Amino acid sequence: KYTRVDEIMEFAKRMGFKKIGIASCVGLIEESKIFAKILRKNGFEVYGAICKVGSFNKTDIGVDEKYTCVTGNVMCKPILQAKLLNKAKTDLNVVVGLCVGHDSLFYKYSKAISTTLVTKDRVLAHNPVGALYQAKAYYKRLLQD
């Protein structure tokens, strides 16, 4: 019986992967640091790329400042995250909490095979399946015609 962390390490070992990339949301940086430490303790080389890499402001491309308050003024750059990990020649990339769409762009541009450790869900403590578990109760409204 393995946790997702164990499964990722076992998969990497069986595939002969040595270099692991972590593409992380800034909101989950502490979790990514813990994951990186675990990977290093288990013999992997770890490379990281945070979503806000490059620090490019949303207002610089014409986004009105009133629309930047939800996630901040600095843009996420999942394609740049992928390119940085490509440059490091990672064998396996692991996504930690990238937003919907940003994760898709990361997967598209990553040259290495990629998997997910954490799926972002700010409401359900990063456990999106919780909504499905509550489909007959709290989320019943989602199934109504």
Residue ranges and their predicted role:
Residues 1-19, 26-30:
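Electropositive, gly/pro-rich neighborhoods at or near active sites that engage anionic ligands
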Residues 3, 72-87, 98-100:
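Active-site glycine-rich loop that binds ribose-phosphate moieties when present
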Residues 21-23, 92:
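Conserved beta-strand elements of the Class I
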Residues 45-52, 109-127:
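Short, acidic/small-residue loops that bind anionic groups at enzyme active sites
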Residues 31-38, 103-112:
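Short Gly/Thr/Asp-enriched flexible loops that form oxyanion-binding sites at enzyme active sites
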Residues 2, 24-32, 54, 96-104:
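Gly/Ser/Thr-rich loops at beta-strand to alpha-helix junctions
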Residues 115-145:
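C-terminal functional extensions of proteins
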Residues 31, 35-81:
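Long, charge-dense
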